[in-house]
Amino acid sequence: YKHSMRLCNEIYSTEDASDETLGLFSTWDFDLSSFQQYAVEALHLGHHVLVSAPTGSGKTLVADAAIRHSSGHHERVIYLSPIKALSNQKFDEFQKKFPEKSVGIITGNVCFNPEAEVLVMTTEILRNTLFQRQMVMEGSLEKGQVDLHFEMDIENDLSKVIFDEVHYLNDPDRGGAVEETMMMLPGSVQLIMLSATIDKPEKLAQWVEGRQTNGDRE
């Protein structure tokens, strides 16, 4: 795709939506807000999604949609949180919401079901795994020298990565892990970024669309 950013801050017009998109909206038994409609449509079309909306406005639905509309081990989803406590909370939540899917969690001291379709982890876990994997590919490390937290065919099996609280990108302590993770992910992976407090979200969107010259998302 040609890289292009679309700012979706107006009322969503269902008159322009396809029947397939309207069918996706009807998955829920309530009317979606405009930003939720824009996000669900963009997810379906394979675009990166950045949602900046107040706490309690329904950002969680966007993450749920990304998980709900992924299927099987060739469309695995990784959900990233900045802190372990939130990872534990989301793991419990996803197990209840998606009983039909396998859900796993990896934190500093817990590794449960790492082969799952939906993996919850802290950002540092994915960053460290991608970094070691990159060093093996470059020949800086032998495969036997690394201790990966999980095994996955990132290029072929990973469909989406959800960055919860993506405003941590601006945090002096944790921001590096978020940025490095985004940089190391293949362009084929769809990014879903959620935040209530991010400053100037359009700047982040512009950075994301330009971060991977070999990517095929917009």
Where are these regions (language model features)?
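Conserved P-loop/Walker A NTP-binding site and adjacent catalytic elements of P-loop NTPases
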Residues: D29-E218
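Pre-P-loop entry segment of helicase/translocase ATPase cores
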Residues: Y1-Q36
